[in-house]
Amino acid sequence: MLQRIISIFVLGLYIVCSACDVYASEHHGRRTCKVFLMPLLLGYYVLNANMVSTFLCAALVFGWIGDLCLMKDGKWPFVFGLTAFMIGHFCYIYVFTRDLLIYSIRPIYYLSLIPYLIYLALSMKHIVPHAGRKMRYPVMVYMVVLLVMSWTALLRCLASGGLPVWIGSLLFLISDTLIACRTFLKGEYKGIMLTYVLAQFLIISGFIS
C-alpha cells in the first residue's frame, strides 16, 4: 500500500514538473524542472515494474544526461546531448528486439519500414544539408538510430502488442525532428517538450503491467 502511494506521488510530481517545463519551454522561462523529469520517471518505473530492466533504466539515465546537455547553448553541449540520447535509443532498441525474439515476425511486417524510409529521405533532403559540414554525418547517424528505434517498437507492437510503446517512439521522433528544425532551419517550433515527456512516459508505461 505504501509503495502504491509513493508511486502515485512520484507520478504526480512527474506530471507537475512536465507541465511546468512544457510551459517554460514555450514561453522562454527558466527550465528548472527539466532536471527532475527523467529521475522521477525512473523512480516511477522501478516502483511499478515486476521485473526492472537495466537497459530501460539506462535509457532514462542517458535521456537525463541528454536533457542536462541540451539545457546549455553551443555546439558541444548539443553534440554530447545527441550522443547521450543516441545511446539511450540503442538501449530501447535492445529491449524491443529482445522481445521480438520471442515472437515470429511475418514477412509482411517488414513493409512497415517504407514510411520510415520516406521520412529518412525527406530528412536527408530538407534538414541534414542545413546541419553544416561537421555536423552533417552525426545528425544522419542519429536520425537512422532514432528511426530504427521507432521501427523496432512498431515491429514489437505488430508481433505482440505494445501500442503505447510505439506511440511513444513516434512522439520521440516528432520531438527530435522539431529540435532539428529549430536548430538547423531556425525559427520557433512548438511542442518539443510536450511530445518528449509524453514519449518517454508512454514508452516506460508500456513495460509496466
Language-model regions: role of each:
Residues 1-209:
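Polytopic alpha-helical membrane-helix bundles and their juxtamembrane interface segments
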